[in-house]
Regions:
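Long, compositionally biased, glycine/small-hydrophobic-enriched stretches that function as flexible linkers
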Residues: 1-139
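N-terminal small/glycine-rich loop or linker at the start of catalytic domains
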Residues: 62-72, 139-163, 282-294, 359-360
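Glycine-rich, proline-tolerant flexible connector loops at the mouths of alpha/beta enzymes
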Residues: 111-116, 123, 127, 187-204, ...
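Alpha-helix-loop-beta-strand connector modules within alpha/beta enzyme cores
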Residues: 133-137, 151-152, 157, 197-225, ...
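Hydrophobic faces of well-ordered beta-strands that scaffold small-molecule active sites
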Residues: 153-162, 185-189, 216-224, 241-245, ...
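Active-site mouth loops of central-metabolism enzymes
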Residues: 155-170, 293-302, 364-373
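Short, acidic/polar
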Residues: 167-177, 229-234, 304-310, 374-379
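Conserved small/polar residues in nucleotide/adenosyl-binding loops
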Residues: 387-394
Length: 399
């Protein structure tokens, strides 16, 4: 495995695979904050050249967090179909990119089970924005809860009827307004102010009563912590179509969210037994580049690789929805509209390549160098790449 290259008479050397991956990443303020980004455009190109010549086997053997230390790494590596992996392991990342851009959906789907997160992230780093849109457009992933999402030519949305005090009347007023706009076919999902069993149960029942009365084909969900939702199920307090949890790409970062793989395995088993939905896909996850660094759990890896690891974590539970909340942390991780757009396209592509039903909450914080035009640009590019789900009323500002 070669870790150096020469460009314009200067030799660029890299410590290891993790260093190559970090420096080959497109410019992100989060990687700069972590002190792992390329110091110049030329160094970034050099890292991409080295990465293009690495094999998928090199990446499999060098996860950014060691297998022995991390439950997300173990979940990712243990899920690999070894027979499929053996067929593709000799491909270089550059050759893998060419395959993805030239192959059809059937051929790409056939090799998904042989991939790891590092492979998925690596090939995304070699792609232009147009490559990401073109490749993602070919990938089809469907999922069914009460309804089915991911079919060609469709776009699903989440209705988020948040309320400052979780007042039921205020929440339901927002639900009715959103439904009148045709929003909410992916899920009616509230971010609760009060994370208690009683409050979560009451809201779930309100949503389900409304859905039944008006025969609304969708799913109900309250985005409380997974342990709160588990208690609701254990006590049979309310119908729950979808179970939610935010995910991170490492065991350390997951700990900051109050979860680990073992807990999520338990939650999945409980939900499978007691869910009120009818289909085989009943988990809902949210992610976003930068979470691991903010939780001091990035292990010196770049935020794109860590995000790809979230998708391997999510895939373990056959989710109905996975949603990257692009730009939600702020300029410390995605500085401006250009970085936000790039991250949204990367995440969408990586999620679909991983094999999960990928959506995007197209948003930005008020102190980012971004505006509504940037959001609309990203939304248009995502729909051009046949993204199947967007968050909220499609576009929003996080204050």
């Amino acid at each position: 495995m070669k870790l150096k290259t020469t460009l314009f008479g200067q030799t660029y050397s890299f410590r290891d695979v993790k260093d190559v991956l970090a420096k080959a990443n497109e410019e992100k303020s989060g990687d700069m904050l972590a002190g792992i980004a390329a110091q110049s455009t030329v160094e970034r190109v050099a890292a991409k050249a080295v990465l293009a010549d690495m094999t998928l086997e090199d990446l499999r053997k060098n996860p950014v967090v060691p297998y022995e230390e991390d439950d997300v790494t173990r979940a990712d590596q243990d899920a690999v179909n070894e027979a499929v992996y053996d067929q593709i392991k000799s491909l270089t990342v550059g050759e893998f990119r060419e395959f993805l851009l030239s192959a059809n959906d059937f051929d790409i789907a056939a090799i998904r089970s042989g991939l790891t997160s590092e492979m998925v992230a690596a090939v995304a780093k070699l792609m232009t924005n147009m490559d990401l849109v073109y490749a993602a457009k070919k990938l089809h992933v469907e999922a069914t809860c009460n309804t089915t999402i991911g079919r060609p030519g469709t776009l699903s949305t989440r209705l988020q009827p948040n309320h400052a005090t979780d007042d039921p009347e205020g929440i339901m007023a927002s639900v009715m307004e959103g439904i009148s706009y045709g929003i909410g076919d992916a899920v009616i999902g509230l971010n609760p102010v009060v994370d208690t069993i009683g409050s979560v149960s009451d809201i779930l029942k309100e949503f389900k009563t409304f859905m039944n009365k008006w025969q609304i084909p969708t799913q109900n969900c309250v985005l409380a912590h997974v342990t709160t939702q588990m208690k609701v199920l254990e006590q049979n307090l309310a119908p729950m179509d979808l179970m939610f949890q935010s995910l991170a790409g490492s065991e350390v970062a997951s700990r900051a969210f109050g979860i680990n793989v073992a807990l999520m395995d338990e939650a999945y088993a409980l939900m499978k037994e007691r869910k009120s939905s009818t289909g085989p896909n009943f988990m809902y996850f949210e992610t976003g580049q930068g979470s691991e660094l903010s939780a001091d759990g990035n292990h010196g890896a770049d935020q794109l690789v860590m995000e790809a690891r979230c998708y391997a974590f999510a895939k373990r539970y056959h989710p109905f929805l996975v949603n990257t909340v692009v730009g939600f942390i702020g300029p410390e991780y995605l500085y401006d509209g250009r970085q936000m757009i790039r991250a949204g396209l990367e995440d969408h592509f990586m999620g679909k390549l991983t094999g999960i039903p990928m959506g995007c909450d197209v948003c930005y914080t008020n102190h980012m160098r971004a505006d509504q035009n940037d959001l609309e640009n990203l939304a248009m590019m995502l729909t051009r790449s046949e993204e199947r789900r967007v968050g909220k009323e499609c576009l929003r500002l996080c204050r």
